[in-house]
Amino acid sequence: MRKSYRVKKETEFQQVFETRNSYANRQFVIYVLEKPGQPHFRVGISVGKKIGNAVARNWVKRRIRQSITELKPQLKQDADFLVIARPTVAGKSQAETKAYLSHALKLAHLLDND
């Protein structure tokens, strides 16, 4: 995923958090900020220390990024969103992570059901 598709700065994270527009399942919390006219979506990923050590957290982040890359054609383009991983996602396979993430994105109305 290219840098232009990522929310990186703390101020950008805060803008999305301040909307208080969140959706959740047992594995992920999704915060959404609608940005009409934006050429493509941007995503920020947050994995807390409750997930495990740095290796485990980076592993979870890689799986989330891979899932988003695979779901990219179906994602709503005019929004910034944050994906916050909950501890229950640790140790899940790539297929399970993608399924849980797609469920959370559908709850947030960010995923088209083509």
Curated annotation (Swiss-Prot):
Disulfide bonds: none annotated. The keyword Nuclease applies. The keyword Acyltransferase does not apply. It catalyses: Endonucleolytic cleavage of RNA, removing 5'-extranucleotides from tRNA precursor. Keywords: Endonuclease, Hydrolase, Nuclease, RNA-binding, tRNA processing. GO terms for biological process: tRNA 5'-leader removal. It comes from the Bacteria. One of its GO terms (cellular component) is ribonuclease P complex. One of its GO terms (molecular function) is ribonuclease P activity. HAMAP family: RNase_P. RNaseP catalyzes the removal of the 5'-leader sequence from pre-tRNA to produce the mature 5'-terminus. It can also cleave other RNA substrates such as 4.5S RNA. The protein component plays an auxiliary but essential role in vivo by binding to the 5'-leader sequence and broadening the substrate specificity of the ribozyme. Consists of a catalytic RNA component (M1 or rnpB) and a protein subunit. Belongs to the RnpA family. This is Ribonuclease P protein component. It comes from Lactiplantibacillus plantarum (strain ATCC BAA-793 / NCIMB 8826 / WCFS1).
